[in-house]
Amino acid sequence: MHIGKHIADVIPHTVNGITELRDVMPTLLDLCESPVPETVDGCSLKKCIFQEASFIRSYLHGEHSFHSQLSNHYIVTEQDKFIWYSETGVEQYFDLVHDPRETHNAIADTDKQKRIAKLRRILIEELQDREEGYSDGTRLICQKPVDLLSNVHDY
């Protein structure tokens, strides 16, 4: 994220950490000294911009919903990424330290099974209370996504 000098006179620097587009809005609101709604998933990076703190997120849960076999959920850390395709059940695992371009799906690699199980458990917990029924708290459950979530009527 580039912050212009008219917003903050800071020395350009890189912040290492797991960030995503969802962090832009809360950062901009925070820079404007406006409240960040509690319903926002992202985190403000303002303290990182002013070098007051480092940004630490142990993992990020993301999703892509295409209403096709490509719909997926993922857990990404600084070291690796676990992907689960919610309509097919296909899983992928990438060791981002040794394979930063994600060319080798290591889901079947014996030496990675313990780590894969840990990331799968995190995803199971992230999806547990979702109305789509992707997880019952003990496993991932494949199914077609619902066409309309119940909260759409809240807007």
Predicted regions and their residues:
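C-terminal cap/loop subdomain of S1 sulfatases and analogous C-terminal strand-loop tails that border
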Residues: 7-10, 22-25, 30-92, 96, ...
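Active-site-proximal N-terminal segment of extracellular/periplasmic enzymes that hydrolyze or transfer
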Residues: 101, 106-112
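Short glycine- and hydrophobic/aromatic-rich loop-to-beta-strand nucleating segment
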Residues: 1-3, 19
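A contiguous, mid-protein "functional segment" used to position or interact
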Residues: 110-136
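Short, solvent-exposed loop/turn segments at secondary-structure boundaries
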Residues: 13-16, 35, 107-108
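Short, solvent-exposed loop/helix junctions and linker helices
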Residues: 15-22, 39, 113
